[in-house]
C-alpha cells in the first residue's frame, strides 16, 4: 500500500512549468507520485535544456504531458483541457492547478531623472581617486558578492520606451487574470478532485514599488484578488485557493527585471539567513499546501522567504 498522499489518477496542471518555480514544483510533486501536465511557451533552441528536465520527471514513473503552446489563448486553452481530459481517462482528475506564468512588461512608467551627484562621487573625492576608477572597483567587487557596495556601483539602466495602457493590460491578463479562465474551464468540465488546490505566485512587488515592475505589480494585485474570489466562491466545489509570496529568487523571470542584480544583493543583505530564496524552497511549500492536511488553508497569501519581508536587519 502506497504512503503517498496522491492517488494514481490525480494530476497537477502547471502553467509555466519549464523553468523556475513551475519546473521545481513539477519535480517536487512528481517525486510524491502526482502525474504532471506542463503548459509552457519556449523556443526550439531552449528545448535542449528543458527536455532532460522532463525526462527526469518521466523517470519517476508518473505520467507527463507537455504542451508547448500559448496558455493565454482561449482556444488553445480549451484544446489542451480537452486533450488532457482524454489522456487522464474517465477516472482522472486535477488535484493541483498552479499558475506560474512569467510573461510581463518591465518598462518604466515615467522618464528617469537626470543623474545627480552621488555618494560615489563624494567618496571618490575624499579618497583622491577618479570616480571612474572607484566605480570599476566597486562594480567588480559587487559582482564577486560584496553586496554592501550596491549603493556605489553603476546604477541599473532602463529603456526610454515607457509603459502604456496596452502593455499594462497584456501583463495583467498574462500574469494575473488568466488564472480565472483556466480555473473556470476545468471546473465547468468537472475535472477537479473533490479536494483540489488552485495556487499561484506573487511577490513583495505587490506592495513595494520596484522600478520597472509597475505592470507586473498590477498583475500580481489582480492575481491576489482572483485567488481570494476563487477561495470564497468555489469552496463549495471543493477548491482551496492560495498564493505563495516568494522571496527574491534567481529565476529567468527575475533576470529580466532591470536592476535584478541589485535586487538580489538587497535581498541577501536583508534576509535573516543571508541568502536568496530558491525555487525548491517554494516548491516544498506548494507541496505542503497540496496535502490533505492543508485543506483548511484557503484564501491566503503564504510568505516563503526565510523572513526576508519582515526583516529590518541588515549586515
Where do the language-model regions lie?
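Aromatic pocket-lining residues of Rossmann-like dinucleotide-binding sites
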Residues: 29, 234, 289
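Catalytic loop of short-chain dehydrogenase/reductase
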Residues: 102-223, 227-236, 248-249
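Short-chain dehydrogenase/reductase
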Residues: 1-167, 179, 183-184, 227-228, 256, ...
